[in-house]
């Protein structure tokens, strides 16, 4: 290669570089700058999305803890209400049993009194009949009362000694 060829190649290369620089360099540079901006924007968006996701995870975790605490409170309240209801039912049953015992005792006492009164009347009638047959006469009311009271007293003494 001669100096002329080298010079020609150099000039041609420079002209070609200027032409490419004028025609293609600006669009290629713009395209590279746009691509750099897009990549930078995508990285910023990805970082923001990651931070948002982390914040959302933290928020959900906090809500979950609050939900668990609320669930524990609800369960404890339900247990407490159940225990109160159970105690109320037990108290009501105990009160009913006590009332039934009192009523039964009252009925027993009344039946005993009625039986004693009936026995007293039967004994009085029997005593009066026996006394009339033995004495052969009718007793007046005071005599009857005295005989009956005396007989009941002796019955009470006899029952008390057994």
UniProtKB/Swiss-Prot annotation:
GO terms for cellular component: plasma membrane; proton-transporting ATP synthase complex. Its main location: membrane. One of its GO terms (molecular function) is proton-transporting ATP synthase activity, rotational mechanism. Pfam families: ATP-synt_B. InterPro entries: ATP_synth_B-like_membr_sf, ATP_synth_b/b'su_bac/chlpt, ATP_synth_F0_bsu_bac, ATP_synthase_B_chain. Keywords: ATP synthesis, Cell membrane, CF(0), Hydrogen ion transport, Ion transport, Membrane, Transmembrane, Transmembrane helix, Transport. It is found in: Cell membrane. F-type ATPases have 2 components, F(1) - the catalytic core - and F(0) - the membrane proton channel. F(1) has five subunits: alpha(3), beta(3), gamma(1), delta(1), epsilon(1). F(0) has three main subunits: a(1), b(2) and c(10-14). The alpha and beta chains form an alternating ring which encloses part of the gamma chain. F(1) is attached to F(0) by a central stalk formed by the gamma and epsilon chains, while a peripheral stalk is formed by the delta and b chains. PANTHER family: ATP SYNTHASE SUBUNIT B, ATP SYNTHASE SUBUNIT B', CHLOROPLASTIC. This is ATP synthase subunit b.
């Amino acid at each position: 290669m001669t100096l002329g060829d080298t010079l020609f190649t150099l000039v041609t290369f420079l002209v070609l570089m200027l032409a490419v620089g004028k025609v293609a360099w600006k669009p290629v540079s713009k395209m590279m700058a746009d691509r750099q901006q897009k990549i930078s924007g995508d990285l910023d968006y990805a970082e923001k999305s990651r931070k948002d996701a982390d914040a959302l995870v933290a928020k959900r975790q906090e809500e979950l803890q609050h939900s668990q605490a609320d669930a524990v409170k609800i369960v404890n309240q339900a247990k407490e209400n159940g225990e109160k209801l159970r105690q109320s039912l037990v108290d009501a049953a105990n009160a009913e049993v006590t009332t039934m015992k009192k009523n039964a005792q009252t009925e027993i006492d009344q039946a005993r009194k009625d039986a004693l009164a009936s026995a007293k009347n039967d004994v009085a009638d029997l005593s009066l009949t026996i006394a009339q047959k033995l004495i052969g006469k009718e007793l007046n009311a005071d005599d009857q009362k005295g005989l009956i009271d005396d007989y009941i007293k002796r019955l009470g003494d006899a029952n008390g000694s057994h």
